[in-house]
Amino acid sequence: MADDIHKKRWGKASVGALIVMIILSSVGSAYANKKEELVPAVSVPAKDQMVSIDINKVNDGHLHRFAYRTKKGTQVRFIVVLKGGSAYGVGLDCCEICGPTGYIEREGQIVCKLCDVVMNKQTIGLPGGCNPIPVKYGVGNGQIRIEQKELDAAAKYFR
């Protein structure tokens, strides 16, 4: 009789452990296969050979994605993020290592969508590694200004 009770307990414990393993593997699988989508880029036109972005639209410290369409029809995506104070990080939405897969913002951090590397915001706008390819820009009259020729030259990364 004691032996039967002991076997029932082991049986129930085994079934319980199996249920817990199934639940954990299902949750883990769902988390691992979760696809994070890029926020759509805001289309920006060139005017007088310059692409301008209102600083008030990008001064919240979050990642902002923009797209400029070249005369040949290539969409050149670039990102802008406030690094702190009045310093901005401006770069292409691609890198030399992973290509034009883009970046996402996850829990306040900028992350490469392909290799999942977390970027230090202070290095955005600097070359190297998986950092966004830098874009030359200027700030004036409440605008971030990028020369059209700079974005036209960057089209080679998005073909």
Set out the residue ranges of the language-model regions:
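Domain-level signature for proteins that mediate thiol-based redox and metal-cofactor handling
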Residues: 86, 119-121, 128-130, 141
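Poly-acidic low-complexity segments
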Residues: 9, 53-54, 120
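Short cysteine/histidine-rich metal-coordination sites, predominantly Zn2+-binding motifs
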Residues: 108-118, 126-136
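Short Cys/His-rich "knuckle" micro-motifs
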Residues: 102-107, 122-124
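Hydrophobic membrane-insertion alpha-helices, especially the h-region
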Residues: 12-28
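Short, Lys/Arg-rich cytosolic juxtamembrane segment immediately N-terminal
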Residues: 3-13
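N-terminal pre-ligand scaffold of iron-sulfur
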Residues: 31-104, 138-159
